[in-house]
């Protein structure tokens, strides 16, 4: 099983290199870089420059806020810089964020994402063939690439894979049919939801003519500590995050499948009334315990096996907040790899 490190999206840029070296030394295979308050390609560059074996994947970069050519060039440069340790993870975000936070168009997201991935692949092919490989459809027209703008060759370095972050069945199907891997969202990483809603879609896409199944990395929220006081604080932090996430209609399917269909509306009502100070208290412990992987170090490998063994190909975990526990966490990583 691929063990993927998460990262605090608000981490100071000058702390990224040390953090990347830390997770590499603990035995993590990959570092996922989100796009929230920093450019994910800048953070990826810092992490890759500081390490020698750690793989880095944007998890995820927002596709619709930038041209596919820009994403392709960034991914190409990072692959070259790292000798093939970078992969491009893409996601859509929700309409309101794309249109109102970024001021970019958002329509037909599944079709647009399909076009985007194909356009990025066309760019990669252009860089390899040293000439323009045109790509044109309803969304993008890439028909010009002069020699002066060709990036340098990367030789035998592996071309970046393209992974997709997906929540709904149509985007999941697109990932299975077109991309190199799938990254789940914290709201759809529950093992029951994966088993009943995600994996069957992937298998169906494979049976529809795709040559092989794609790897799936689950990205659950986690609370992993031996300290009761730290556990209490982490639980409250994660409940606040869940209250924010589950107020978004697009993230409701897990709530429905677990029997909490009314919770999303309740959270949205509190937002509309500007009553969010203690909205995390709306998250019941029964739901929290199902969707958040909570464990001590000793039990972590067992919990991962119980929830995700045989179901997914990788899992994201956040390293300890206290670096004194790094050795114990590294032992957890070794144990997970041995039993999965």
What is each residue range found by the language model?
Residues 1-58, 64, 159-160:
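N-terminal beta1-alpha1-beta2 module of alpha/beta enzyme domains
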Residues 1-28, 79, 87, 121, ...:
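C-terminal amphipathic alpha-helical "assembly" element
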Residues 2-14, 61-68, 156-167, 222-225, ...:
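Active-site mouth loops of central-metabolism enzymes
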